[in-house]
């Protein structure tokens, strides 16, 4: 073990789990192991290994070839507490803390931030779904020395809030999600394993397949997906209708969403729908790549979406997308300014969001649908946040566009989508994610100054 490496304590979903937070936590760790040692307080809802210490050094050394790779997990049910954190700090003696996911999960961490920042910095890999600027998050953001914003919209939010508190440019960085291009890629037509996968789920019977791969929860609007698909298929002659299919890779029933089989039975009883998640068995990377390759278009109609990892995975597999213009989904659209250059994170400091359609020119790999209704929602902990609703008829028209252009054009546009995601200036591969994390953290280590033991502030 190299004593020259900085050790970082990661607070997030267990890197071995399958959630979006877990997936990106793993990519961050695996793509920076050559630079840092990692310890994780590894969260799960009811963690079966709570109280154990999991040493993954041999596993990651074998996988990466990095001889001094260091990764140790401290599993916990929930996101931890001050006692667990203090114990792990005492054992591991990290040089910094990196936490990730919604700030409301970290109120206990923010309550002791001053105690911690006297000795080590706190970093935050953060995202916020929508406008208006959440000033109720101000004190949460101020508990971190470095904020890495996952979306351009979040970068703008962080900047607008923290510029009033003396934060310097190095303390706020745009650091988008990244996926491994070796796990998500275009499979050649006729591949035996892909054909076997399609046969297993009955996908081989259809010529045009629309994929929903998301959680079955309200803000993802799976019911609107059904209605958009209906609007699309209703426009086709009967023989062509039979050759189309809607794929749901999600739990068919979820108390946080709906009963999708009941919705489909009522709304599209005569149209083809396939559920690939009936047994709640999570697909491995290879199977996820198969399903993106099998689909002709990927669809995300979420009315609040921090980033939209699955649409990026679709682009990496060279599958065109239809997305609602909200949150981080707009970063995957390749919106351009009047001079032909892409919108940057700094543009979003003033723009806020492109959900009102100020900029319309976009990449050929996507049919963006702008919200037809923007309403202000809220709760006691999040008093206000916009809900961006796309009209399902407009989404149906976007699906019809991809149907009409045919497979050759879809293939061409899908390839452009992968090229966009892999562009080093876009930064949406796993390796580029690691590079961006290293750049931000190394700068923070260089410039960070410990907090004074006591501070006074006018309130």
Task: Give, region by region, the residue ranges found by the protein language model.
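N-terminal subdomain of nucleotide-sugar transferases
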Residues: 1-58, 92, 457-459
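A short helix/loop element that forms part of the nucleotide-sugar donor recognition site in Leloir-type
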Residues: 185-203
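Short hydrophobic beta-strand element within catalytic cores of glycosyltransferases
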Residues: 320-323, 340-344
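C-terminal amphipathic helix plus adjacent low-complexity
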Residues: 360-459
């Amino acid at each position: 073990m190299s004593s020259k490496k900085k050790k970082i304590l990661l607070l997030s979903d267990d890197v071995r789990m399958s959630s979006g937070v877990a997936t990106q936590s793993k990519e961050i760790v695996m793509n920076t192991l050559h630079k840092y040692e990692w310890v994780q307080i590894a969260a799960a809802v009811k963690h079966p290994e709570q109280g154990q210490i999991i040493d993954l050094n041999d596993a990651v050394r074998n996988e990466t070839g990095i001889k001094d790779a260091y990764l140790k997990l401290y599993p916990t049910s929930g996101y931890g507490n001050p006692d667990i954190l203090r114990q792990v700090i005492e054992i591991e003696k990290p040089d910094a803390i990196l936490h990730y996911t919604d700030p409301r999960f970290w109120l206990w961490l923010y309550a002791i931030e001053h105690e911690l920042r006297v000795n080590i910095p706190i970093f935050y890999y953060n995202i916020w779904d929508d406008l208006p600027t959440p000033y109720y998050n101000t004190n949460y953001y101020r508990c971190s020395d470095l904020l890495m914003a996952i979306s351009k919209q979040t970068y703008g939010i962080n900047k607008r809030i923290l510029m009033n508190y003396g934060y310097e440019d190095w303390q706020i960085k745009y650091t988008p999600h990244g996926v491994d291009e070796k796990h998500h890629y275009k499979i050649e037509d006729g591949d035996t394993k892909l054909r076997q996968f399609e046969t297993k789920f009955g996908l081989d019977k259809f010529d045009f397949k629309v994929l929903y791969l998301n959680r079955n929860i309200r803000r993802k609007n799976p019911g609107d997906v059904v209605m958009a698909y209906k609007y699309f298929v209703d426009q086709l002659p009967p023989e062509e209708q039979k050759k189309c299919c809607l794929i749901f890779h999600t739990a068919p029933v979820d108390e946080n969403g709906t009963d999708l089989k009941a919705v489909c039975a009522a709304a599209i009883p005569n149209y083809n729908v396939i559920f690939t998640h009936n047994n709640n068995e999570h697909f491995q990377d290879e199977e996820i790549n198969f399903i993106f390759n099998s689909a002709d278009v990927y669809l995300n109609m979420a009315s609040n979406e921090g980033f939209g990892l699955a649409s990026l995975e679709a682009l990496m597999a060279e599958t065109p997308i239809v997305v609602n213009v909200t949150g981080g989904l707009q970063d995957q659209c390749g919106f351009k300014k009047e001079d032909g250059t892409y919108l940057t994170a700094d543009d979003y400091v003033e723009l806020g969001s492109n959900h009102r359609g100020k900029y319309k020119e976009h990449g050929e790999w996507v049919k963006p649908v702008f919200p037809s209704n923007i309403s202000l929602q809220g709760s006691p902990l999040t008093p206000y946040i916009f809900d961006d609703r796309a009209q399902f008829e407009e989404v149906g028209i976007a699906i019809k566009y991809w149907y009409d252009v045919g497979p050759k054009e879809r293939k061409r546009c899908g390839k452009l989508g992968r090229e966009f995601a892999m562009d080093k200036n876009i930064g949406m591969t796993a390796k580029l994610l690691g590079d961006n994390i290293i750049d931000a953290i190394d700068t923070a280590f260089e410039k960070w100054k410990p907090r004074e033991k006591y501070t006074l502030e006018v309130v």
